[in-house]
Regions:
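Active-site-proximal region of nucleotide-activated glycan assembly enzymes
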Residues: 125-178
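Short Gly/Thr/Asp-enriched flexible loops that form oxyanion-binding sites at enzyme active sites
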Residues: 108-125
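Structural motif
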Residues: 9, 37, 106-108, 130
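N-terminal subdomain of nucleotide-sugar transferases
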Residues: 1-43
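Conserved acidic residues
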Residues: 66, 102, 152
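Conserved nucleotide-sugar phosphate-binding/catalytic loop shared by glycosyltransferases and other
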Residues: 35-81
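Short N-terminal targeting/anchoring amphipathic segment
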Residues: 94-111
Length: 178
């Protein structure tokens, strides 16, 4: 049986650090072919203190399949974020069509993550969402909940978030707290 192809999306520098243990575990398994897509603000020097180093660090960690996806527009206002999210859907759809992953994994609540989740949903690709159910009181919270509704597998980071996911109607068999 061929290995399952997992596409892990990283759209900010901090998500590299937060996902490192997961990436290492996925990468060491023979039954998984791991692809990491770096995009969004993870590729912009203005937002990433270690600009350009995410790819280098992934390579040093032994990740073989690394893809860069440029779709973030310059600026920091609502119009730019909305346009970036739209462009991101287009770019992620192309990437997913080329890679044909069995599963896409996203983390968080940013507009770039929503782009990946939306593309995966429309392409009928299974989606895992890490950090669903968290609350922030910001616009990002609505985006997080939208991503939750697009996801098939939910990985909460605390029990309160797991309970919120269940109250949102998610299948208890697909909701986990790690």
């Amino acid at each position: 049986m061929p290995p399952r192809k997992i596409c892990f999306v990283i759209t900010s520098f901090i998500h590299y650090a937060r996902n490192l243990l997961i990436l290492e575990e996925l990468n060491r398994r023979d039954d998984i072919e791991l692809h990491v897509v770096i995009g969004g603000t993870a590729l912009l020097s203005k937002y990433t203190p270690r600009y350009g180093q995410v790819r280098t660090m992934l390579e040093e960690d032994g990740i073989e399949h690394i893809h860069e996806l440029y779709f973030a527009l310059e600026g920091d206002n609502r119009v730019v974020k909305a346009k970036t999210a739209g462009l991101g859907i287009v770019e992620f759809a192309t990437m997913f069509n080329d890679l044909k992953p069995d599963l896409v994994v996203v983390r968080g609540d940013r507009f770039e993550v929503l782009s990946a989740a939306t593309a995966a949903a429309y392409m009928n690709i299974s989606l895992a969402h890490i950090e669903g159910g968290d609350i922030t009181g910001t616009l990002d919270e609505s985006v997080r909940h939208a991503i939750t509704k697009l996801a098939h597998l939910h990985i909460a980071t605390n029990e309160a978030a797991r309970e919120r996911l269940l109250r949102m109607g998610e299948d208890p068999r697909s909701v986990f707290n790690f």
